[in-house]
Regions:
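Noncatalytic luminal/extracellular "stalk/propeptide" segments of secretory-pathway proteins
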Residues: 1-94
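Stable alpha-helical elements in mature extracytoplasmic
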Residues: 1-2, 7, 106-110, 115, ...
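Surface-exposed loop and adjacent secondary-structure segments within mature catalytic domains
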Residues: 124-158
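A conserved hydrophobic secondary-structure block that centers on an alpha-helix together
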Residues: 65-131
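Soluble non-cytosolic domains of exported or imported proteins
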Residues: 56, 101-109, 153-157
Length: 175
């Protein structure tokens, strides 16, 4: 209608297929701490992510700070674990989308690449320049050559906390 009103001489309405993803139930996750305590993570599923099922996903966490580090660690270290892509946005870039693009690699292709090495799930640091409790989501892309694994974004505050805890302890379990 608007195109015709604007004077376009030829307007077509054509059907097309578009991906459709529906967010499931509210996502929850936590880190199991010594003494039976837990730390609740602020997280949200990445767009296009598969769900974790009724039983969820639970495993130890391996932190990586780049795609190169993931590839260097390989299947012997990654298999059966949850990969935590802790790739912060570079605050020194004047053009914030440059930082966004570099940090976004973990979100865009991290789940597919982690699955290649046998990971059972992925957590990514939210793409935000500030430290806060609000997870930011976006989409991920899977590779049909590897299993689709659940993927979530965690808040930047929780990413900082989790990274610090991983430096202190050799094993942390996330559910």
């Amino acid at each position: 209608r608007m195109l015709k009103e604007a004077g376009a001489d030829t307007v077509y309405l054509q059907p097309c297929m578009v991906p459709h993803w529906v967010r499931g139930d509210k996502e929850t996750g936590y880190v199991k701490l010594p003494g039976g305590k837990k730390y609740d993570l602020k997280l949200t599923a990445l767009g296009n992510s598969v769900g974790s099922g009724a039983k969820g996903v639970q495993s130890s966490v391996i932190e990586v700070r780049s795609m190169a580090e993931l590839h260097d660690l390989g299947e012997n270290v990654i298999k059966g674990k949850i990969v935590f892509f802790n790739i912060p946005m570079n605050p020194t870039y004047i053009r914030s989308f440059r930082a966004y693009g570099q940090a976004g690699i973990g979100r865009r292709s991290g789940p597919a690449q982690a699955a290649k090495y046998g990971a059972i799930g992925v957590m990514v640091r939210s793409l935000a320049s500030n430290i806060d409790e609000y997870p930011h989501t976006g989409t991920t892309q899977y590779n049909d050559s590897f299993p689709k694994i659940p993927a979530v974004a965690i808040s930047t505050k929780d990413a900082e906390w989790l990274s610090g805890e991983l430096r202190k302890k050799t094993q942390l379990s996330v559910f």
